[in-house]
Amino acid sequence: MKRMQETSFLFGSKAFLEALDNQLQIKKVNLSDKHQKLLGLIKKRGLRYEMHSSQWFHQQFRHINHQEFVCVINPNQMLKTIEQLIQITDSKSTSTLVMLHEIQDPHNFGAILRTCMAAEVDGIIFKKHNQAPINSTVIRTSMGTVFYQNLVQVTNLSYAITTLQKHGFWTVATTLDERLKPKDYRQVDFDKRILLVGNEDKGLNALLLKNADLKVKIPMNPKLNSLNVSVAVGIILFGWKS
């Protein structure tokens, strides 16, 4: 299926409680005496935990807003397979998915996830390699929305596109290359669509562009070459919703 890194950190009690609400397995909880109120819940759940001093947290997680409460989880448990995503969307007459090609910046990844949640996207598909993993930065930037979304990690985006096309999805690729004659994104009128967006610097590769059913762009001031990828995703998704 898919493998991300084996561990990731959650910072703060809010993220911990969200993880419990979503029935995620927590490997260990590191906390200080200031979180005594949660110690009873931790013991009741039978979770492994360690008590640490404030100094320990500041040494281990320098420059991070750790709140003296850090959980260790396996992020792989948040992932679904492409088959599970198809099961979710097959019964829907309309559906929007987002597919990411090698997004490198975890802040961009997290911001995209947050936007996808707000825009009621049914699933986000991303690569196993050359892609920012789901880590503490992504979780924090997503404002915890990562826990509530259908996330699919694949080794081959082209295969995922072909599979989803067989289930009624049309692939809409973003590009800045005017030679490809991209249309205004507002002209898209597919009931089931995949928004395919590329790497922050290189965009989409030739194969993905070839496999796309339609190429689109965001009309903008000609003095501007491009937008931040997370901003572009937001503009298109909410443009489609309206």
Curated annotation (Swiss-Prot):
Kindly list the GO CC terms recorded for this protein: cytosol
Q: Which residues bind S-adenosyl-L-methionine?
A: G198, I218, L227
Give the Gene Ontology MF terms in alphabetical order. Answer: RNA binding; RNA methyltransferase activity
- Pfam families per UniProt: SpoU_methylase, SpoU_sub_bind
- Per its UniProt record, what InterPro entries does this chain match? Alpha/beta_knot_MTases (IPR029028), Ribosomal_eL30-like_sf (IPR029064), rRNA_MeTrfase_TrmH (IPR004441), SpoU_MeTrfase (IPR001537), SpoU_subst-bd (IPR013123), tRNA_m1G_MTases_N (IPR029026)
Q: Which domain of life is it from?
A: Bacteria
GO biological processes: methylation; RNA processing
Tell me if Manganese is a UniProt keyword of this record: no
List all disulphide bridges recorded for this chain. Answer: none
The entry's keywords? Methyltransferase, Transferase
Signal sequence annotation: none
Q: What is its EC number?
A: 2.1.1.-
Family that this chain belongs to: Belongs to the class IV-like SAM-binding methyltransferase superfamily. RNA methyltransferase TrmH family.
Matching entries from NCBIfam families are given as: rRNA_methyl_3
Protein name, entry field: Uncharacterized tRNA/rRNA methyltransferase MG252 homolog
